[in-house]
Regions:
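A short, polar/proline- and glycine-enriched secondary-structure boundary/capping micro-motif
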Residues: 68-73
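Core segments of cupin and vicinal oxygen chelate
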Residues: 15-66
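A detector for short, charged/polar N-terminal pre-domain segments
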Residues: 1-4
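Vicinal oxygen chelate
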Residues: 19-20, 41, 75-119
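Short alpha-helical segments used as structural interaction elements across diverse proteins
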Residues: 7-8, 53, 106
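Short aromatic/hydrophobic contact patches that present stacked aromatics
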Residues: 11-13, 48, 95-97
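Core-facing hydrophobic residues within beta-strands of well-ordered domains
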Residues: 6-9, 93
Length: 119
């Protein structure tokens, strides 16, 4: 497989230091609609804002996130699972999610693993 059929950006997830101020800025100042939000029990919170055209901007707030950390943020395992090591710092990008056909996700994962990407 050489080509991934990516149909745009689904969402971008960033890490913030203050969720209340972040929500206030994106809703009250920029006028974005808060589409969903939920608690990550014992870890923090996750919220999404509508950017239009099917794209969203997501923010994590982690209760133990460092103020800053060099490199790319990552969560080896699923956030909130109690396993893995969250290394997302305030002001970092946690992940970028693309719109892809859900039927093809397993094949795409297999293809990137074969290219040496750790998942």
């Amino acid at each position: 497989m050489n080509k991934f059929e990516i149909n745009g950006v689904h969402h971008l997830a960033l890490v913030c230091k203050d969720m209340e101020r972040t929500v206030e800025f994106y809703t009250d100042v920029l006028g974005m609609r808060l589409t969903k939000g939920f608690d990550l029990e014992g870890y923090g919170q996750h919220f999404f804002f509508d950017m239009g055209n099917g794209s969203e901007l997501g923010f994590f707030w982690f209760n133990d996130a460092p103020l800053s950390q060099p490199g790319v943020a990552s969560a080896k395992n699923i956030v909130g699972s109690g396993s893995g090591n969250i290394t997302s710092a305030h002001g970092s990008m946690n992940h970028l999610a693309f719109n892809v056909d859900p039927v093809k996700i397993a094949n795409y994962r297999e293809a990137i693993v074969k290219k040496g990407v750790q998942c």
